[in-house]
């Protein structure tokens, strides 16, 4: 029985679990991508693996791109300063 549990756990680790999140996509220096149109944000987001994206007007960081179902390996805006 223990072998079955260990093998199941090993298979889970080997296959990996990929998750997604909705967030402001960020540049490497923790700065958002400012925007004016939904089309530009949708292209930026989908090019980075998200399902879609749009320009969030008047949000927390001004007019910035918000991505829906963005992969975990793509940087997002986190609390703290933008380091330009």
UniProtKB/Swiss-Prot annotation:
CDD domains: neurotoxins_LC_scorpion (cd23106). It comes from the Eukaryota. Belongs to the long (4 C-C) scorpion toxin superfamily. Sodium channel inhibitor family. Alpha subfamily. Negative results: does not inhibit rNav1.2/SCN2A (EC(50) is >30000 nM) channels. It comes from Olivierus martensii (Manchurian scorpion). Residues 21-83 form the LCN-type CS-alpha/beta domain. Alpha toxins bind voltage-independently at site-3 of sodium channels (Nav) and inhibit the inactivation of the activated channels, thereby blocking neuronal transmission. This recombinant toxin selectively inhibits the fast inactivation of mNav1.4/SCN4A (EC(50)=82.3 nM) (tested in HEK293 cells). Expressed by the venom gland. Residues 84 form a propeptide. GO terms for cellular component: extracellular region. SMART domains: Knot1 (SM00505). Disulfide bonds join 31-82, 35-55, 41-65, 45-67. This is Neurotoxin BmK-M11. Pfam families: Toxin_3. Keywords: Disulfide bond, Ion channel impairing toxin, Neurotoxin, Secreted, Signal, Toxin, Voltage-gated sodium channel impairing toxin.
């Amino acid at each position: 029985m223990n072998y079955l549990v260990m093998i199941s756990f090993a298979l889970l680790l080997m296959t990996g679990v990929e998750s997604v999140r909705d967030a402001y996509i960020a540049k490497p220096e923790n700065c958002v991508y400012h925007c004016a149109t939904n089309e530009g944000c949708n292209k930026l987001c989908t090019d980075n693996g998200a399902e879609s994206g749009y320009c969030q007007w008047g949000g927390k960081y001004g007019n910035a791109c918000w991505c829906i179902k963005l992969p975990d390996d793509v940087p997002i805006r986190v609390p703290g300063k933008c380091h330009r």
